Amino acid sequence: EMQRSLVGSEMCIRDSSQTVPVTVTAFDPEANLALLRLKNEADAAFLDKLVPVTLGNAPRLGDKVTFWQFNDDGLPITTSGTLLATESSSPFTNSEPFVLYNVKSSVTPLKGGAGNPIMRDNKLVALSASCDPSAQKALAVTHTMISRFLQQARSGNYTGFPADGTQVTELTDPVFRKFLGLPETGGGFYVVKLPVYGSFYKAGVRPGDVVESVNGIPLDSKGLIRDPALGPVSANVLFRDSAMPGDIITLGIRRKGKDGVSQPMTLDVKLDRSALEGDLVNPSPFIANP
């Protein structure tokens, strides 16, 4: 358990009064993830009292998982659950949503409900984000997000997840598709508006464009991709959850011409966080290394 104060950050064991100072090497308030290290080498023995866990394989729909919690005496409390689907949500800050796991479980959070490990075969596969025991529903930070966070955090230069700020709508209405000059069948999402300082706009995407694919992966008419392990998933996972600032993605788009015909084209987008950094009020002002 980590405790923060004006003096600094400390880590303690639930069933012990011992605390040690730690340094926060990377912190992401959007994803509620942090990477810590001991501040003093002399406290290395403190870690011997902890049980390490490893990051397991990414779960699939239908997999059984276990929520781990610990009471004030350090005793474990476990609750089972089943991964049912994914859901786009931003539970920690008022920023762009992530793709989170939707887990059916009656887990009742002891403190806050966020940050508790979710295990499968005694390996970490997710972290709790929010719990609703009455609905038997829990949202969880995904394996993809944890892996991506650790990969960048270990590099020593953590900058956060890409954010573009583009607002889109689905293309399920056949009348709307006809108005846009699109084929009767097909997929994609319609770009309603986007910030001029965002990565999509800087790459040439404009309001009225239809994004049909990302890196060659087709989107359905709701703007979803078909993930082999998770089923229908928001395309955001390709340019936010699993990506890093500086990554380049290729968008397959259609743009309606003056003749009313929608023409296909491709655009390469260099992902960044300029949509947040350009806002007058930044919802996540402390995304960089503390």
Predicted regions and their residues:
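PDZ domains, with a preference for the canonical peptide-binding region formed by the helix
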Residues: 143, 202, 213-252
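C-terminal, low-ordered peptide segments at domain boundaries
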Residues: 42-46, 51-55, 61, 222-223, ...
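PDZ/PDZ-like peptide-tail recognition elements
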Residues: 148-190, 272-290
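Conserved catalytic-core segment of clan PA serine endopeptidases
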Residues: 10, 14-42, 70, 240, ...
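Active-site region of chymotrypsin-like
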Residues: 39-51, 76-140, 184-192
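PDZ/PDZ-like domain segments forming the peptide/carboxylate-binding groove
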Residues: 107-117, 169-213, 217-220, 290
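Single conserved hydrophobic/aromatic residue that forms the stacking wall/gate
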Residues: 1-8, 12-13
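Short glycine/Trp-rich loop-beta-loop segment that forms part of the substrate-binding cleft
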Residues: 10, 14, 53-77
